[in-house]
């Protein structure tokens, strides 16, 4: 290699190095399930009962309303009915214990009303601002609103062989916990925060 070609490669190498460092930094700090009475696959704890298979993982909300991650601690849950009969998924099926305190999930109605209030307030921009940098996109806000509704885990009857999946949201103070126990259908799953 000539000296000129080496000099032109330095910015590329630096860019790749920085990108890899950022990606590695994003991967750290997540919650990982500790071994227990469940399987672990791709960060999910997989719990099996006679009639249900449940996969659980603390995970940032990936929908359009990204501010939700600042306001709540989110957990992604997948539930499959492995029996030949209809099974009821009770609303009290999932909770989190951390620091000796139990946290129940936040109702969807509360989250949606909070988001709706934010959308209404965004419409009333500063009247003295002559050059708003970003106009309010009401259509996008409504899409994000409905996407949030659709991605929330629903409870109730689960038909044979059918599955439900979605997010449950908890108190944001759980983001600071080094360890937490997610109770899924009475089976405790311990998660520890990565380094």
Describe each PLM feature range.
Residues 1-26:
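Sec-dependent bacterial lipoprotein signal peptides
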Residues 26-195:
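Conserved functional micro-motifs across diverse proteins
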């Amino acid at each position: 290699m000539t000296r000129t070609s080496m000099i032109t490669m330095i910015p590329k190498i630096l860019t790749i190095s920085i990108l890899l460092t950022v990606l590695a930094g994003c991967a750290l700090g997540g919650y990982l399930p500790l071994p227990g009475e469940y399987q672990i696959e791709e960060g999910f704890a997989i719990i099996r009962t006679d009639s249900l298979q449940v996969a659980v993982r603390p995970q940032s909300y990936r929908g359009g309303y990204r501010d939700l991650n600042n306001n709540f601690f989110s957990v992604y849950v997948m539930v499959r009915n492995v029996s030949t009969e209809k099974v009821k998924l009770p609303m009290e099926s999932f909770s989190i214990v951390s620091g000796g305190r139990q946290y129940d999930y936040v109702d969807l109605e509360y989250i949606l009303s909070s988001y709706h209030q934010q959308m209404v307030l965004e419409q009333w921009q500063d009247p003295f601002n002559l050059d708003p940098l970003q106009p309010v996109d009401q259509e996008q806000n409504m899409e994000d609103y409905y996407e949030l509704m659709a991605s929330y885990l629903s409870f109730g009857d689960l038909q044979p062989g059918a599955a439900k999946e979605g997010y449950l949201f908890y108190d944001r103070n759980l983001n600071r916990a080094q360890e937490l126990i997610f109770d899924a259908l009475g089976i405790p799953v311990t998660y520890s925060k990565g380094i």
